From Swiss-Prot:
PANTHER family: OROTIDINE 5'-PHOSPHATE DECARBOXYLASE. This is Orotidine 5'-phosphate decarboxylase. Its EC number is 4.1.1.23. InterPro entries: Aldolase_TIM, OMPdecase, OMPdecase_AS, OMPdecase_bac, OMPdeCOase_dom, RibuloseP-bd_barrel. Substrate binds at residues 18, 40, 67-76, 122, 183, 192, 213. Pfam families: OMPdecase. It catalyses: orotidine 5'-phosphate + H(+) = UMP + CO2. Homodimer. GO terms for molecular function: orotidine-5'-phosphate decarboxylase activity. Keywords: Decarboxylase, Lyase, Pyrimidine biosynthesis. The active site is at 69 (proton donor). Belongs to the OMP decarboxylase family. Type 1 subfamily.
Length: 238
């Protein structure tokens, strides 16, 4: 399915709960309060009880991005997506391989689950792709996978904001472009290689921004989130 692009910044900021325990995740959510309404849960937290925590966030009227990056045979993908759709989470990722995406779209039909195709990880650059056996550079591969996600009927894609402008011109206008690797000006890149500031990412055409360490690792998490939201609101809708 497709997803409505939010005009309000609070619906477009997704805070990554990249923490080791449910207790720490609960602390982050409590500290952020009503400032943040959308959270990403990935492998680290899933393996510490994160699926039940995702359900509790949904029950508390928060939105959940389940970042599982699924890739398997069609039937396994379909059965997994069917169960995720019943959880009430808002977004689910899978790798942008055509057969897997088509199976997922069919399995999610009739639900409110927005399926996102992962193009190229923002921690990878052209040298990493060559080492992994790919002949395309990052932008070419991202655009190829974005078009395949479009053709499969996916709700959106996950890609670096560096490629967002080119992607926006290549896919349906209602497709979500969800961008990790968001770093406020002056912050450390960490293990990310293709990064952009919140304002520049929105200008480039991103619909949603994933921010983890700059908020979760900040001394004052709520202040960090509010600063990013202020920057996002200064841009308005891209």
């Amino acid at each position: 399915m497709t997803t409505e692009l939010h005009d309000d910044a609070s619906g477009r900021l997704i805070v990554g709960l990249d923490v080791p325990t449910i207790a720490e995740a609960e602390k982050v959510v409590e500290e952020l309060g009503n400032a943040v309404s959308f959270y990403k849960i990935g492998y680290q937290l899933v393996f510490a009880g994160g699926l039940d925590f995702a359900k509790s966030l949904v029950a508390a009227r928060k939105k959940v991005f389940l970042d599982m990056k699924l890739l398997d045979i069609d039937n396994t993908i379909a059965k997994g997506v069917e169960n995720v759709a019943k959880m009430g989470v808002s977004m689910l990722t899978l790798h942008a391989y055509p057969k897997a995406m088509r199976a997922a779209v069919e399995a999610a039909r009739g639900s409110d689950l927005c399926l996102l195709g992962v193009t190229v990880l923002t921690s990878m650059d052209n040298a990493d792709l060559r080492e992994a056996g790919y002949f395309d550079n990052a932008e070419t591969l991202v655009l190829k996978r974005a078009r395949q996600a479009h053709e499969a009927g996916m709700g959106g894609i996950v890609a670096s904001a560096v490629e967002a402008q080119a992607i926006r011109q290549a896919v349906r206008p209602d497709m979500a472009i969800v961008t990790p690797g968001i770093r406020p000006a002056g912050s450390e890149k960490g293990d990310q290689k293709r990064v952009m500031t919140p304002a520049d990412a929105l200008r480039a055409g991103a619909s949603h921004l994933i921010v983890a360490r700059p908020i979760v690792g900040a001394p004052d998490r709520k202040a960090a989130a509010l600063a990013i939201l202020k920057e996002m609101r200064s841009i308005g809708r891209s």
